[in-house]
Amino acid sequence: MAPTNTKDSDTPGWLHRHGTSVLGSVARQACKQPIYTLVITALLATMTYTSLLEGSLYNANLTRLSNSHLNQLDVTDFLQGSRSLRLGKATAWQWETDDESMSDQEVRPSFFLDPVASHLALITLVFPTSENNPGISAVQESIISDLAAAQLVSRTPSVLSSTFRETSITLSVPYNNLEEVLRKTQNFPQPEAEHSWTLKNAGKCNSGPKLRLWLIDVLASFVGLIKHAQIIDIIIMLLAYLAMHLTFLSLFMSMRQLGSRFWLAYSVLLSGFFSLFFGLKVTTSSGVSTSMITLSECLPILVIIVGFEKPIRLTRAVLRAATESYLPAKPMARRSTPEAIEVAIMREGWRIVRDYAIEIAILAAGATSRVQGALPQFCFLAAWILLFDSLLLFTFYISVLCVKLEITRIRKHVEPRRALEDDDISTGNQDFDSRVFGCKVKAANISRFKFLMVGGFVLFNVLQLSSLTYGNVRVSDWMPYLSNLSNTLMPAPINPYRVARNGLDDIYVASRANNIETRVTVLPPIKYVLQSQSRHCRDNFAGPLCDTLRGRTLGCVLAWLEDPVISKWVIAALFLSLVLNSYLMKAARWNLRQSEVIPDSSATVSQTKDSSNKLAEKRTVDAMLQEGRVSLLEDEEIVNLCLRGKISAHALEKTMERHPTMSRLEAFTRAVKIRRTVVSRTPSTIDVSSSLEYSKAPFENYDYTLVHGACCENIIGYLPLPVGAAGPLVIDGRNYFIPMATTEGVLVASASRGCKAINAGGGAVTVINADGMTRGPCLAFSSVSRAAEAKQWIDSDEGKKILATAFNSTSRFARLQGLKSAQAGTYLYVRFKSTTGDAMGMNMISKGVEKALEVMKGHGFSDMSTISVTGNYCVDKKPAAINWIDGRGKSVVAEALIPADAVRSVLKTDVDALVELNTAKNLVGSAMAGSIGGFNVHASNLVAAVLLATGQDPAQNVESSSCITIMKNVNNNLHISVSMPCIEVGTIGGGTILEPQAAMLDLLGVRGAHATNPGDNARQLARIVAAAVLAGELSTCAALAAGHLVSAHMAHNRSKVAAKTG
């Protein structure tokens, strides 16, 4: 049922199918004409950016400069970003902020319909101070004498005023006199000095916004924002911008892993900027107001949250589809680049669109919410940005990918031919098939393509220049169309309490004392600069002259070219055009060179063709080998490298792991496939191993990442081993199904019959008498007496304590239980015995032994040499009396009492027959043979099956199956027991990490380490092994006693011979 459910769940729905079809159609059209798509998108984005720039920056600067030139001051310029406060009985004599900034009052005159007794304006004049600048005392005297309507109030110093060396003066003036006061404060001449305080940007030559002045203005605005911001806000924004740039870095690193060092990541960022321009255009056209401050604060958060995962996923899918088209399994079915892109969109397109839809829906919900502040406006803008980003991903970025893949393919196919031409070898041109974007082309087509590329970029630059030439002739003509832009990009309102708190306190005291209702408009700080008067006069004179000498068209063009962003974009576009054309011109030149080579005769062409192809292929493969890009070669090429000895077969996993688009599992599976081919084609064994490549030994759908470096080397596949479940069997009061991996028929069935008989008597009972793994190193000394001294020291309490301390320091689970030594001439054998937790423990105890021997050398035995860390005194994987007597691993005894009725009904025999059989066969017969630990029927069968099923070391079956089976007649019932002193199992490490074996451990409930008592899981597994042996011994002895063993094996475990014909 599981496969059916999976299939049903994976079936795409109607929306999925039709959405993917639409995406495929869009991408297909973009891939047919990728250059047109790129140029049109860039042209639209540039036009959008230019309109935004003209409406927000250029026209604003032009208006301000023209007004200053005519000495006409516009109060609305100073009111932008201001805030209005009111005080009176209606506000309970508390300052209340109006909902809208003063910049909106010009648009909505109804704002002033609510009359008040007094309407004041608070002006903060900011002067930079330094050691060379004169003081501002003269400025204060000038204000007192010349501005009768203005009053000095307490200034509010900024937290960062001392850092930036600024001094301010705060004035309170009637709102009706604001324009007059501002006009008189444009310039404060210094008496007996050649300098004067001049209002920033006042009186400059109307020559357009220079780059240096623009940068200074931006820097000053930035500093002003910092001075009036809280420290925590600054820290948060710094962290946001840092995280945003880390996101950019992650994008470049991800694209570099996919094989692109710069261009793909750059294209993703460029697509993001285009989306921002389009989103701003739609937002401004919709009348939604979003300030530049809000953009600068929220855009980093949007970049961090959304990220660039979608373009990376699409790129990875396209590269994978392109790589699959070059697999050796389908040498004649290579996809074109548009086909590879279409396959990638079929796989990932719908998921990407679904993610975009979810994000846009969340932003749309935020845009329609009633949350106070700028969040709804920014959500509206962000939703449009993501919408355009999704459209550009499947048009603009898909075109970039198409061009990138085509250029890579052209270079890959042309490099071998270039190598041949350098050696004066002709390959002919009959079979050369040059395809660009899936269509067959000639050299003339490529030349025409280059012309269109260059012409397209030149055309769009000319159009942009023309649009600007005729666009800024009169600012007033354009203002109705750009009003929305001006509203959108206007400065954010200031915080009046940070700018003029002390001045507001003075007004509050006066108004409350006189009981006068008051409205106060707090203007943003007005900056002043110190200028030379002579230079100021020259600038005033040069203004009209500049306008006269230069035409309006030329001024607009120069102003546009001086813009810091547009100029960079023009340079970037021209550079991109140059790079693309360089690639295409090289491809066209190589193609033309190839067509100019005329073969002398058909015989020469045919003879040269094969040899030249082989030579070119060999050179290309060798070059990629030297560059460390073997994983990008085809399988057949890698096989040839292995057979030539250029690549070691055992290192294929490490080599394939470097593939940029393959997962680690896919790379390892590919390595196994290649190694099978190498083994099959190795010349020295090809007569016997040639069948492996196409044999039925499986190698796919297996997790080789778990095997690599842990379980096996030189992997050529895996062998499915049948696994049966015997039982259930009650062991110490709990039911278990016992997994057995075996190819011997009747074994699982026999064990299941034994389980049934044991359950009839209440189940099996197990006990563990000992738990300790052993390791016996061999030590050599210069003389027998030195070996004896070492033996005495090891057997002493002091020696045991020192060795135990050193041994136990190597692991938190290893605890030395005992030492046993034996001397043979100058050789000394020491048997370490230690607990090892839930691990089988061979590696753990070996590490402890090495540490103990190292410490022993420092206690008077520096002349000792270690022959081997294992001296066969352990004893490991060999039958030995010492294991039978002292035990190794888990020493387990299991017993069961079988009722006489169950013996007759289930086992088909009687108690006395079983007792006599066991005595004669298992005890006397094994003694006659001189067996060590072999006093059983077939304990090794059961032990090996359980060890294989649970991921144990199968070789440990040699000592683990040491067993003595005892049967007794107790009150006409059968009492059976098995004693097994050397069960060596673990539940962590080794083969237990493999998924199938781990699943069998889960079946027994003993997977991994025990959570509270280390070692309990491994001991429980040893109990289960002993109980399984108990069931197997019981059933097989019964079959022997009843004479059923041979007939059962003949019926279930004998190969059927094919019938003879003819």
Swiss-Prot record:
Chain ranges passing through the membrane: 35-55, 231-251, 262-282, 288-308, 356-375, 378-398, 451-471, 565-585
GO cellular component: endoplasmic reticulum membrane; peroxisomal membrane
CDD domains in the record: HMG-CoA_reductase_classI
Cysteines engaged in disulfide bonds, as pairs: none
Sorted UniProt keywords: Endoplasmic reticulum, Glycoprotein, Lipid biosynthesis, Lipid metabolism, Membrane, NADP, Oxidoreductase, Steroid biosynthesis, Steroid metabolism, Sterol biosynthesis, Sterol metabolism, Transmembrane, Transmembrane helix
A Pfam family it matches: Sterol-sensing
InterPro entries: HMG-CoA_N_dom (IPR025583), HMG_CoA_Rdtase (IPR002202), HMG_CoA_Rdtase_cat_sf (IPR023074), HMG_CoA_Rdtase_CS (IPR023076), HMG_CoA_Rdtase_eu_arc (IPR004554), HMG_CoA_Rdtase_N (IPR023282), HMG_CoA_Rdtase_NAD(P)-bd_sf (IPR009023), HMG_CoA_Rdtase_sub-bd_dom_sf (IPR009029)
Name this polypeptide is given: 3-hydroxy-3-methylglutaryl-coenzyme A reductase 2
